[in-house]
A protein has these predicted regions:
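Membrane-proximal, lumen/periplasm-facing interface regions of secretory-pathway glyco-
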Residues: 1-49, 59-61, 68-70, 80, ...
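Short periplasmic/luminal acceptor-recognition loop of GT-C membrane glycosyltransferases, typified by
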Residues: 48-85, 111-117, 143
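Periplasmic/luminal catalytic loop of GT-C fold multi-pass membrane glycosyltransferases
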Residues: 67, 87-142
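Short, solvent-exposed mixed-charge patches
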Residues: 147-148
Length: 148
């Protein structure tokens, strides 16, 4: 017995389409809890963030890349493991306010910084000429460069 090609040829394409259709619903989360992401701050300053080059944490960068997929102007996101050791170390040094942090922000043309309020970088930017605090919440702070 040989099954008819006409009767079984539909199964594989239909199964593939169902798998593809179901995976789109799982590709990105539909909500980002305020307890983990600065969603209200980002929503409030959406127009500025969308236009600027943003330095943020890798986790928050992933959220921003979901919110603003084009043009991609975020320094780092959740794929940090793939950016290479040197780049990742540069990111960590900048976030921790180590020597050279200002050079990194200048080299990449960073216009906005969105970081947890307690990071060393946030502490430094609060007193660094050329940076203005836009808004601070209990968990996040947004800075804007005054240098075009």
């Amino acid at each position: 017995y040989q099954p008819s090609l006409e009767r079984t040829s539909w199964f594989l394409p239909v199964a593939a389409m169902l798998l593809l259709f179901c995976s789109f619903g799982l590709a990105y989360p539909t909500d980002f809890p305020e307890s983990l992401y600065p969603t209200s701050l980002v929503t409030h300053h959406s127009a500025d963030i969308e236009r600027g080059r943003v330095f943020t944490t890798d986790g928050w960068g992933h959220y921003l890349s979901f919110r603003y997929p084009e043009p991609y102007r975020i320094y780092i996101d959740g794929r940090a493991d793939f950016f290479g050791e040197r780049f990742t170390q540069e990111y960590l040094d900048t976030l921790n306010g180590k020597p050279g942090w200002q050079d990194t922000l200048q080299r990449y043309g960073v216009e906005m910084v969105l970081v947890p309020a307690e990071t060393p970088l946030a502490t430094l930017l609060r007193s660094t000429p050329g940076w203005r605090m836009v808004e601070e919440t209990s968990s996040a702070v947004l800075f804007s460069s005054l240098v075009p």
